[in-house]
Structures are given as C-alpha cells and as structure tokens.
Amino acid sequence: MSAIEVVRPGMLTTVQDWPGRIGYWHVGVPPSGPMDDLSFRIGNRVLGNPEGAAGLECTRGGPALRFPDGGRVCVTGAPVVVTLDGTPVPQWQSIAVPAGSVLDVATLTGPGMRCYVLVAGGLQELEYLGSTATFTLGTFGGHDGRPLREGDVLTAAPDSGPLDGRPARAAIDEQPSIGHRWEIAVTEGPHAAPEFFTRADIETIIGTDYTVHFNSDRTGVRLVGPKPQWARSDGGEAGLHPSNIHDNAYCVGALDFTGDTPILLGPDGPSLGGFVCPVTVVAAERWKLGQMAPGDTVRFVPVRADRAPSLRTIDVDRRASFPLVISTSSDNDDGVLSRFIASDGTDVTLRRAGDGGVLVEYGPMTLDLVMRARVHVLYEHLLAQDIPGIIELTPGVRSLQVQFDPSAMSIAEMTDLLAGLDGKLPPSHQLVVPSRTVRLPLSWDDPATHEAIQRYMHGVRADAPWCPWNIEFIRRINGLDDVAQVHDIVFNAEYLVLGLGDVYLGAPVATPLDPRHRLVTTKYNPARTWTPENAVGIGGAYLCIYGMEGPGGYQFVGRTTQVWNHCHPGSAQSFEPGTPWLLRYFDRISFYPVSAEELLHLRAEMAAGRGDVAIDDGKFSLGDYQDFLTDNDASIAAFRQQQAVAFSAERRAWDEAGEFRRAS
C-alpha cells in the first residue's frame, strides 16, 4: 500500500470504479461510476490494472497530488495540462512518479468536461453495496461519500507492474474524440411515436442540434431545443402534462422529457419516474455524456440496436475515435418490440429500453392494481429462474424493466423469452403477498417544503399554477371545497407501495388503496432543482417520499422521517441488518400528524440509529381488494367524476393561460 496526499482537490474530484454499483436499481440506487467510462477504462488498461479499478474522476479541473512513495499514473479524458514537479507530461500513457513528487492536473479549458487520474494498483476505499464509486447526492461510496478535500490521504494498492506485452500508452485510434459538437447513437424507445410523440416530434428530435444547458451534472445532461407538440393532450391519471406516464424504470442514457425539458439521464440519475423517454443512448456511446460541456451541440443518430458497438470493448471496435456516427438505418419500429394479447385477455407491450433493456407493460395506461400484480408475478418468476445475463429487474406501476447483458443474449432473444412466458405464470388475480403496515409521522405543510417552493419561484419559475402553495393547487385540481379536505384525505389514506426508488434511495411510489383517497395532480414543469430529504408529495395519482435531497416534481404535502439508513452497515432500529432501505413492495403506509419541531427531533433520532417506526406484518389479497372495489363502486365512481370535472376545468384554465404553449 502507498499513500497519496491531496495538495489541491480540484473543482470536483471523486473516487469512482467501473461498472459501479450494480444490482440495486430496483431500490433507487444508481450505478454511479465514471461518467466517461471509456477514458477511465483505457487508463486502467494502460497501467495494467483491471479495467474497473478505482480511480479519480475530475470535473472541470484536476487535483494536485503528492506521492510520498512514488508510483505510476495515467491521465486520460478531456485534454488538460498535466505536470510532474512543474514539467509537462503527456496524457494517455504510463508516467512514473518519483517518491515525493507532485502530479498537477490543471483546469480544463475545453473541449470536454472530465479528465481521469488512474493509479497503478488502483485506489483502495471501503465498498458500499459492492462498489467504491462515489454517489455524492447519497453521501456514500468513495472517500467518505464526498468529493476530495485538501489534506485528504488516499491509499493505492501495490503496483503489480505492467502486464507482459501491454502497451505503455493508448493508441491514437483508441482514444475517444472529444470536441464541441457531438453525434450520439440512439435506439428508438421506449416511449416514442405515435402514442406519446407525434411523428413530427420524432423527426425534430432526430434532426435538431440541441445545446447543452449549464445546469447539467452527473444526474443528467439537460438540453435546450424545440418544445414537442405531443400526441396526447395530457397524461390522464399520471398527470396533466402529456409527458406524464405511470411510473416506470428508466435506464442510464435515456432522453427523459421532464415536461417539455429533455434530459439525458446520467450514471447518478434516478431509476424510477413518470416521464416519457423517446430514444435511448446505446451503452457504448454513454461515455460521451461525461464530456458534454455547456454550449456544446448534440445531434441524435438512430441506429439499429443489434448493430451497436459493445460496451465491453474499449479498442478500435468501439469506434470512439470517430466524431461522427455512421448509421444506414434505425430499427423503424417506434421502440415497440412486440404487442400481443395474453392468454387471459391482457394487452402486453414489450418496448425497447436501449440496446440492453426491455420494458414489459401490462394493460391500458391506467392505474390498476391487477396489472401491478401481474408485474409482481413476472418479477418473482424471473428472480427465481436466475437467468444468466439478466442484470437488473425493476418493477414500475404497470411495467417491469429487464436490463441484460447484450453480449449474453440479443434483444430478440430476450423478447422471445419474455413473450414465451405467457400462460406459464401463476394467475395474478389470486395473488396474496406479504404486506406490512408502516406508520410514519408527517409534518403537514412543513417549513422545508415552503423553502423549496420559494427557491423554485426565485430560481426556476414564479408563475407556475402550483405556486405559491402546492396544497391549494391539489385542492383546486381535485374539486375539493377547502384544504382541510386535502389534509383529511392524506391522513385517512392507506398507501400501497408499488415501486421503490422514486426518487432515489428506497423512496416509495405508492397509491391509496381506496380510490376515493386518490388525489390526482400534475408534476412540476420544469422540475424543481432542490427538494428536501424525505419531503412527501403527490404526482399523478401517486405519493412519493423523497429518499434524499435533489430534483423533484411532486406537489408537496409535508415531510416525514428517513426511509434510507445512512448508518449502513451499522445497525438501526426498523431497518433490517445489511438492508439500508426501510420499505418493501406492497407495504401499506399511513401517516400520523406531528409538528415541524417534533419531526426534527424524530429525524435526529433516526439519523442516530435510535428512531423506531411502527411496522406490523400482514398480507394483501388481490381477491379481497377486488371485492372491496365492487362493494363501493357507486361512491368511487362519484368521487372520480368530481375529480374529472375539476381536472378538465384546470386543463382549460391552463390552455387559456398558454401553459401548454409555454417554452421550456
């Protein structure tokens, strides 16, 4: 082991490894890892390290590092001035660092956004959920879950020396082309034309040079470009804006329209959400997201999924040294791989989610717990089968995303496998699953939510229909007489957890079991840039508890205690050992009122590992639930009619005010 002293940390320098934190997408943990994986992996290969060995990612500028014991390094990524004791040294090759010397990586002047410092032997840090990659928003991984600071001391593993025959530098035709104009290969889907976007919208997306917005980071690259015309007038139960859909799993590299704003989701992006994604960057091209700088232009080039280069290769076959994407055709299927009617009469749609993913959707675009039960049956079956090549299984409201290794099986093979399961799964209408009751405190209309709204009004938009008070907006769009009714409904409801990770870290997306408690809203457009940790909001027909600070779009009703154990792997009451997420699928959440001051005390207790949550075991029977709906059909229909009238009135008001014509 050898020490590395941080003399100057750089603007934003973090420890990353590749492929990052895999296997936790279903609970809202992103992979993290190097945003430009190609430059990172090439640097490790030059040094004789495993491609995924931990190294440093440096955004906009690099650090100054002292090597008391000496070592070898390789600096890759965006072009930058690198010196060793004041003498310039080249990038993309192994550099011997004498004992006591200082390696200095300067500020990037462009093109590109990130450079990488790889060290022979790789950096040594404690793993969190199987990886040393830093997720700064979650404050875990890497060096104390944060960017480097002056005075930090890193540790490198012993240098085993270069492997026989391994080049000491990366060949020119292996180095990625980094400029100010980007072409990036995308596949169609999962949600394209004509269901969600018009044909003209898709032509515009493909034919436009988008500009990279300054408000971009590892969660996603925000783009500036034309506003879609949209194929739908709204998102129905999912929200008033046509970009809204029932929550489903995203994938890294998806072009996510949060309202009218396009964002390319990055390696620290969310796993679950309720917005449409018309195209997805192929895995081997995602490195480009890490080098896109504000003001750069981006052009999407459709390609056939089965002809996309492999993520696993980092040599000339990756074609990264070419600034242009060569493509003769796309799949020309709107991202729809298969549509059929299941043996029980259910509509099934299989959608492409990049070159290594399939999104299975059941039924019409409505909230139906029978469809969520079908998703659960498929999820449990695939888990039990332990099929080689499947990497992640992430349930949504009416969908299941299957991520797989395209070098192990093709999209066509995965499509055939999933379609072939029809009729082989147990009937979902007989589903009985474990279902715990979970009682959480709720500080109604908490001051932290008011702060978030004020930040939004001052920094994003002040004229939004949901400002200055989200609860009043919820009242209005649901046709209720006063905000006290909103309060009573929220506290009387029992919310069934349908998904985890919306947004991040075990955050539940849940819906009231009783449809008469389903308050329907739309989401912020554009989204908030800041949401307090554990804020509680409603978007579409769903409730969310935000797992951490970050962006968001649900309408606030209050704030609760933590749903993620940041003391992990230390023990904490209510959390199972080794499992930092509190909630499970099909848990039933209810709230009891506390003051803002009481909540602060409860949150402090939870953070210290002393807090407790009332949890009781139970079961959820879909058959019994169907009987409940039948018995209360008339009053449920009356409530929905009241909502529909108010929803239509709000939509007309938006139309008259030009909300749908508003530029993003």
Language-model features and meaning:
Residues M1-S664:
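Conserved "landmark" site that anchors the functional core of diverse proteins
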